């Protein structure tokens, strides 16, 4: 197993992203699991720096799109143009033709442009003028968004939220972390200190090893019971989808791998439950506090759903 390489990436990213080590670990786990990530928080806490540092540490091709109201779907997927000299049409690649797409402030653009990401996030390909083109492998979308209610923001559709493997916030640094940021960021943003430590091929190999992490039937049952509990809870009008259950499984496998284990334990599932489920479920309230209420319900579900006991032997 090559999980030590994942730790090298984490240590490299921390050169640019100071504090909040758990956020770096969450993103690394999601990358190993092969899913897309949504980072939601207020401006200025390091969302973009975190994403750019990962792209640099993994030495992969990355594009960044600042999602504003005037960004068009063709900017994302690409488009065909006519070449008069060759008397034919050719494809001009869009932003998705990379390994890591940083979709900055994704909830500030139009729903039509947001929808342009749907196919590529799920299928790993784009269709332009009837022709389907695969994106490079590996492919990952790291999207950032400001909290709903901020000026110029709008809700992402549930169908798009469900395509993000996890969603998490960063939060403000504590006093010691903020002191470190001030001392180390008087000039530059720290990204110049980040060096490539793995290749895209090594990342693909690690992802394959994650898929081979063993999952006991009792752990499968635990995931199903958690998912069923979200669907049968009166406080939630939208429970965890089967895609969400699969996301929880993948994140648990990736966490076990990163911790140096070849098997999943219930603690892996419990540790990833909130980040996988909070953006997928919906409470009966439709107010701006919906996500907060849903998180509280999920925490209660986690406490009330018994984890499988370790086997004796």
Q: Language-model segments: which ranges?
A:
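Dynamic helix-loop-helix/coil hinge segments at AAA+ ATPase domain boundaries and subdomain interfaces
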Residues: 1-23, 212-214
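Conserved alpha-helical scaffold flanking the Walker A/P-loop in AAA+ ATPase domains
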Residues: 25-29, 82-102
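Walker B catalytic acidic pair
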Residues: 41, 104-105, 116
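P-loop (Walker A) phosphate-binding loop of NTP-binding proteins
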Residues: 42, 76, 144
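AAA+/P-loop NTPase substrate/partner-engagement loops
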Residues: 57-85
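Canonical AAA+ ATPase core
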Residues: 83-88, 109, 113, 121-213, ...
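C-terminal engagement/docking regions of AAA+ P-loop ATPases
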Residues: 232-313
């Amino acid at each position: 197993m090559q999980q030590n390489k994942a730790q090298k990436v984490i240590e490299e990213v921390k050169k640019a992203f100071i504090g909040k080590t758990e956020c770096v670990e969450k993103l690394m786990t999601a990358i190993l699991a092969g899913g897309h990530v949504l980072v939601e928080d207020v401006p200025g806490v390091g969302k973009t720096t975190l994403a750019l540092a990962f792209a640099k540490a993994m030495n992969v091709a990355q594009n960044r799109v600042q999602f504003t109201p005037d960004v068009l779907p063709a900017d994302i997927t690409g488009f065909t143009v006519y070449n008069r000299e060759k008397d034919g049409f050719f494809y001009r690649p869009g932003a998705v033709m990379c390994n890591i797409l940083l979709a900055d402030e994704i909830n500030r653009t139009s729903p039509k442009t947001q929808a342009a990401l749907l196919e590529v996030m799920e299928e790993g390909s784009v269709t332009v003028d009837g022709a389907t083109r695969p994106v490079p492998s590996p492919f990952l979308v790291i999207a950032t968004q400001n909290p709903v209610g901020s000026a110029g923001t709008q809700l992402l559709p549930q169908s798009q939220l469900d395509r993000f493997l996890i969603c998490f916030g960063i939060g403000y640094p504590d006093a010691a972390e903020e002191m470190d940021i001030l001392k180390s960021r008087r000039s530059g943003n720290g990204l110049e200190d980040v060096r490539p430590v793995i290749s895209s091929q090594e990342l693909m190999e690690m992802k394959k090893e994650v898929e081979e992490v063993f999952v006991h039937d009792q752990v499968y049952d635990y995931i199903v019971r958690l998912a069923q509990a979200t669907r049968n809870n009166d406080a939630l009008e939208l429970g965890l989808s089967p895609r969400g259950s699969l996301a929880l499984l993948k994140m648990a496998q990736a966490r076990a791998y990163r911790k140096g284990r070849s098997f999943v334990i219930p603690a892996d599932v419990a540790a990833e439950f909130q980040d996988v489920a909070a953006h997928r479920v919906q409470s009966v309230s439709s107010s701006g506090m919906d996500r907060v209420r849903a998180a509280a319900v999920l925490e209660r579900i986690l406490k009330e759903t018994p984890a499988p006991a370790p086997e004796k032997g």
